[in-house]
Amino acid sequence: MKTNQNLRFYWRKTHNKLMLGLSYISVIIGLFWLCWILFTLITKGIPALSIDLFTQSTPAPNEKGGLLNALIGSFFIVGAGTLIGTPIGVLAGTYLAEYGRYSRFAQITRFLNDILLSAPSIIIGLFVYSLYVSKIEHFSGWAGAFALALLLIPIVVRTTDNMLLLVPNNLREAAAALGCSQWQVIMMICYRAAKSGILTGVLLAVARISGETAPLLFTALSNQFLSWNMNEPIANLPVVIYQYAASPFTDWNNLAWAGAALITLFVLCLNIFTRLFFQHKK
């Protein structure tokens, strides 16, 4: 009897060590590739950073220049996409959590939202191209903003839905007992309780769409000039990085690495700020 118990204990102990070892190996493999990517980005991107990046537009081959037009274009496109997508996402998430809750329509909407959340970004770009760009017969900054908004909306919907569902029903019932309407309860109670989580979701969504390239290839494309007109093709950092990284010109390659470093630093800082802000609010 004791022999069988010892064997079972030995097998469980061995099995535990084996699985723990495999887990460590998996973590090491994942961190290895991440560290390699970051190391390559730092060694090639950081040395390429200079003041010219922020004062000059993208140059012709073998000439000095910067990424000013691409930075401004990305700011406009990402900003417009955020302004378009955030209200839609928050309102849709509010309906799912406060009005639809567990209704069949809400469940179907959540399912469709999850599909859109996992859809490849290039599919979104093709959709906007066929719906908008092909109709106006030219690329447009607004088309790029619309494509990024479609990528941002499902993230904000899911975050808003989850955060509002975490608000205790006792708060809603107490407000209703004081004579508040449902919309007043949502605005004054639920939003205040969930605002940190909703803001976190919005910031993480902005971090995600900031580096998207595929949708912009089919919508905003790019140009070589400093442009403020969102009705025309407008330069943006992801597409410039894609074009310059694939070019045979060394100066363009260096600008691509510098642009990649800028996007990475922006996303990193935004994620750090989001986590610190969220922890502080807790």
UniProtKB/Swiss-Prot annotation:
Kindly give the CDD domains that the UniProt entry links to this protein: TM_PBP2
Q: Which InterPro entries match?
A: MetI-like, MetI-like_sf, Phosphate_PstA, Phosphate_transprt_permease
ABC transmembrane type-1 domain segment(s):
71-274
Coiled-coil intervals:
none
Q: Does the keyword Phosphoprotein apply?
A: no
The protein's predominant localisation is membrane
The role this protein plays is: Part of the binding-protein-dependent transport system for phosphate; probably responsible for the translocation of the substrate across the membrane.
List the protein's name: Phosphate transport system permease protein PstA
